Amino acid sequence: MALATNSAAVSGGAAAAASSAPQPRLAATFLPMRRRTVSAVHAADPAKSNGPVQAAAKASSPSTVAAPEKKPVGLGKWTVDSWKAKKALQLPEYPSQEELDSVLKTIETFPPVVFAGEARHLEERLADAAMGRAFVLQGGDCAESFKEFNANNIRDTFRILLQMGAVLMFGGQMPVVKVVGRMAGQFAKPRSDSFEERDGVKLPSYRGDNINGDTFDEKSRVPDPQRMIRAYAQSVATLNLLRAFATGGYAAMQRVTQWNLDFMDHSEQGDRRYRELAHRVDEALGFMTAAGLTVDHPIMTTTDFWTSHECLLLPYEQSLTREDSTSGLFYDCSAHMLWVGERTRQLDGAHVEFLRGVANPLGIKVSDKMNPRDLVKLIEILNPSNKPGRITIITRMGAENMRVKLPHLIRAVRNSGQIVTWITDPMHGNTIKAPCGLKTRPFDSILAEVRAFFDVHDQEGSHPGGIHLEMTGQNVTECIGGSRTVTFDDLSDRYHTHCDPRLNASQSLELAFIIAERLRRRRMRSGVNSNLPLPPLAF
């Protein structure tokens, strides 16, 4: 059996350089603050560093105090395959090393899925969220599948993200960074056990469609490297469709606003505040039209978006890593943003070693098990230059643990002078087993963790920077609760997930309205923008 860690190295010189795409238009910020120029250099490859650089950013709390670049002790020179010298968890064993090497060499010749310039622009937007000037919306499937790949599913999820983004932007009166995570690349999944047993039959666990199949038979569960090529093709096709939706008029603000009005008119959600907000957005657009402000301007008909996924299958990620011709830095061109999961974030592990050398914005999944000192060390390894926007901390720990554990993490990061973006994943800490045996997540528990996240940041004087959701635009019955109540008895009606339960379209939008109200109250308390009549036009 050949370990995936033994795959052939990708030569940085042989890989095609990913040219930086033209920078997308920056959404205008309306916050009454003068944005200070951020001066920081992130040395993705330590060899390219010109020495310590001071990162300067506008400080709204002690957590934004920059620190000089420090090279953590024990780190050697980074290369695209230096991760192979480290212990790699959660990687499959392929039966044929020769076939694996052949597939990886083929992927090396493929064009990049995304461009370096787009990733840099996302980093700038995430830096805004770190400073409280934007809010991140990250959402999508638990795990993409080959079987359910079709244009309608992609469209429906993107549509809900657009609706949520409009609601959050109006409520928070700030730009919303739509990181369309878990799309165009979110296939691989970490597993608690390497094997699964049913009725006395023991087989390798299902690890995602880019590794093996979910059918419980011996042939399907054998890791197949050819699946990586199919995953690449599906990622490119998905991103191509998303780009068309984002720039072809589908994302127009008037259209999105009408969707939200229709949702309120045809839903059982009778909360007057939600209806009020939806109608206020519509009235704002009507005022603009009456004042002669065109709603056909590109700023009103298009939207920026980015993709992200968990960096898990390292041979695949390495094969799509390219040296950017404009900066000389290496980018993992499989997605704009990557995150390291709870099971693979070891300080001396292969996944951290790989990620410290790519210049993409990075996420770190953090549970209640995270030691504050270890978090500070991990951030030092991944962001030695302390560059704003480089690191996003994604907390996932349940409401009660959030109130106890998160303050210590925030204080440790603040005291170290590290600049990060804090967002909450209220899904993974709230998974339970229903009486019927299916996994589910109660909407009330998800909401409780979101509220705890905001409460803690209010208490600590830090910025709640965003939310990370497993969700779909389909009318599934996988999470119980919500105003259109899904009960335990309803779960089997439309339970389609290949992995973990997702919020359906109604539950996702309901959560967005609740968060928007919380953002509005936070804004009114702080006095920021309380005298401004309209939100920014871009979303």
UniProtKB/Swiss-Prot annotation:
Keywords: Amino-acid biosynthesis, Aromatic amino acid biosynthesis, Chloroplast, Plastid, Transferase, Transit peptide. It comes from the Eukaryota. GO terms for cellular component: chloroplast. Residues 7-21 have a biased composition (Low complexity). It is found in: Plastid, Chloroplast. GO terms for biological process: amino acid biosynthetic process; aromatic amino acid family biosynthetic process; chorismate biosynthetic process. Residues 1-23, 41-70 are annotated as: Disordered. Residues 1-54 form a transit peptide. Its main location: plastid. It catalyses: D-erythrose 4-phosphate + phosphoenolpyruvate + H2O = 7-phospho-2-dehydro-3-deoxy-D-arabino-heptonate + phosphate. This is Phospho-2-dehydro-3-deoxyheptonate aldolase 2, chloroplastic. It comes from Oryza sativa subsp. japonica.
